[in-house]
Design a protein with these regions (language model features):
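Hydrophobic transmembrane helix module of multi-pass membrane transport proteins
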Residues: 1-36, 47-51
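Small-residue-rich hydrophobic transmembrane alpha-helices
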Residues: 1-12, 111, 124-188, 219-233, ...
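Hydrophobic faces of transmembrane alpha-helices in multi-pass small-molecule transporters and flippases
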Residues: 10-17, 54, 59-62, 78-109, ...
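Small-residue-enriched core segments of transmembrane alpha-helices in multipass membrane transport
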Residues: 16-23, 130-133, 210, 243-249
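Short alpha-helical transmembrane segments in multi-pass integral membrane proteins
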Residues: 22, 37-94, 150-215
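Membrane-embedded alpha-helical transmembrane segments of multi-pass integral membrane proteins
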Residues: 26, 56-59, 219-222
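Helix-terminus/linker motif at the lipid-water interface of multi-pass membrane proteins
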Residues: 31-40, 101-134, 152-153, 190-199
Length: 249
């Protein structure tokens, strides 16, 4: 988030792209016992992912220390805490944290409620949600970008540019979501087939994917709006809307 806030989103992108081959290498090596590493089977996937993130942490520390635009901030240097400066980060961070928790928790709760319907229903539901999370990456990315851009423009007292970015961001998110949903609708059998081969599983997964289409268009609008409000330093309203939408309605 610190790197993104400085507008260095490409640095963050390269770090996360680096995580993919690292994760593949450690997972493959520890699951099947390759390159002198022990064969751990399923648990090797968890250990491999943990090791990949540790390597990524080391790389990120090096970037923070060596990157010319990050080095002057001395992020890793120790200074005496200034408690007076904590108020604003907590005022913004706590509602955002509760917002994320509320959204993740409701989907986790739904997963638990699905348990009584049998393993095939759980698997189909999980497959549909997994692909929905992938589709949600587009509006979520636009939301994060709008938070950065809008806050920049507001800081420069440039309300006109901020409004232009807001309109452009929401429009882009809706268009991408619409194209994604059209593609998803006509390719449901292929997507379901990626997660299993049973005909009954594929048919049930297609039903869940159809339901997921209903809320993804709403996410295409809601996610950018959340990013916009955070750019205006308003984190309470997205939290209230999340609480009402996910836990009350």
């Amino acid at each position: 988030s610190f790197i993104d806030a400085l507008g260095l989103t490409r640095v963050s992108m390269f770090l996360m792209i680096l995580l993919v081959p690292l994760n593949m290498f450690f997972n493959y090596s520890l699951i099947y016992g390759k390159f002198g590493l022990p064969e751990l089977g399923g648990p090797g996937a968890g250990l491999g992912t943990a090791m990949a993130y540790w390597v990524l942490l080391i790389v990120a520390i090096v970037v923070l220390k060596k990157h010319p635009k990050l080095k002057p901030y001395h992020v890793l240097s120790f200074e005496r805490p200034h408690l007076s400066l904590w108020k604003e980060p907590f005022a913004l961070g706590l509602p955002i944290g509760f917002n994320v928790f509320g959204e993740v928790a409701i989907f986790a709760l739904v997963g638990l409620l699905m348990a009584k319907f049998g393993s095939q229903v759980i698997a189909s539901h999980q497959a549909a949600m997994n692909f929905s999370y992938l589709a949600y990456a587009f509006p979520m990315s636009i939301s994060n970008a709008l938070t950065i851009i809008v806050s920049y423009e507001i800081g420069q007292k440039n309300q006109k540019s901020a409004k232009e970015y807001i309109r452009l961001g929401i429009f882009t998110s809706v268009i991408i979501a619409f194209l994604t949903l059209v593609w998803l609708y006509f390719n449901r059998p292929m997507i379901a087939g990626l997660y299993g081969t049973s005909e009954s599983f594929i048919q049930l997964t297609m039903v869940f994917l159809s339901y997921s289409l209903l809320f993804q268009m709403f996410d295409a609008v809601a996610a950018p709006i959340q990013g916009i409000l955070r750019g205006y330093k308003d984190a309470k309203m997205p939290f209230i809307l999340c609480l009402l939408g996910f836990w009350v309605i």
